[in-house]
UniProtKB/Swiss-Prot annotation:
<dbReference type="InterPro" id="IPR001063">
    <property type="entry name" value="Ribosomal_uL22"/>
</dbReference>
<dbReference type="InterPro" id="IPR005727">
    <property type="entry name" value="Ribosomal_uL22_bac/chlpt-type"/>
</dbReference>
<dbReference type="GO" id="GO:0003735">
    <property type="term" value="F:structural constituent of ribosome"/>
</dbReference>
<keyword id="KW-0687">Ribonucleoprotein</keyword>
<keyword id="KW-0694">RNA-binding</keyword>
<keyword id="KW-0689">Ribosomal protein</keyword>
<dbReference type="InterPro" id="IPR018260">
    <property type="entry name" value="Ribosomal_uL22_CS"/>
</dbReference>
<comment type="function">
    <text>This protein binds specifically to 23S rRNA; its binding is stimulated by other ribosomal proteins, e.g. L4, L17, and L20. It is important during the early stages of 50S assembly. It makes multiple contacts with different domains of the 23S rRNA in the assembled 50S subunit and ribosome.</text>
</comment>
<dbReference type="InterPro" id="IPR036394">
    <property type="entry name" value="Ribosomal_uL22_sf"/>
</dbReference>
<dbReference type="InterPro" id="IPR047867">
    <property type="entry name" value="Ribosomal_uL22_bac/org-type"/>
</dbReference>
<dbReference type="GO" id="GO:0022625">
    <property type="term" value="C:cytosolic large ribosomal subunit"/>
</dbReference>
<comment type="similarity">
    <text>Belongs to the universal ribosomal protein uL22 family.</text>
</comment>
<comment type="subunit">
    <text>Part of the 50S ribosomal subunit.</text>
</comment>
<protein>
    <recommendedName>
        <fullName>Large ribosomal subunit protein uL22</fullName>
    </recommendedName>
</protein>
<keyword id="KW-0699">rRNA-binding</keyword>
<dbReference type="GO" id="GO:0019843">
    <property type="term" value="F:rRNA binding"/>
</dbReference>
<comment type="function">
    <text>The globular domain of the protein is located near the polypeptide exit tunnel on the outside of the subunit, while an extended beta-hairpin is found that lines the wall of the exit tunnel in the center of the 70S ribosome.</text>
</comment>
Amino acid sequence: MEARAQARYIRVTPMKARRVVDLIRGMDATEAQAVLRFAPQAASVPVGKVLDSAIANAAHNYDHTDADSLFISEAYVDEGPTLKRFRPRAQGRAYRIRKRTSHITVVVSSKEGTR
């Protein structure tokens, strides 16, 4: 049994979001929630929301209400589209600002069947 959740077009750079996702990959779901709650990175907030959504999807789709028996089987961050902006500089120049976005995916599975 596995349940997945995805957040798309999140305004966090993929490199910074991957640092957070690498922390929780393979952890128990409740332990990962605690780690994300106290992680100092800004990307831990959207990753935590995706994890909560994956746990809720498992409860809804499979009547699997016990979050203690779930673990994170897959977690990855893909790069979304980049918003391009310009910052005016001296003597008529302009520097490009790239505002990167991320697609965050978390898959939770039950422990008894997979591990």
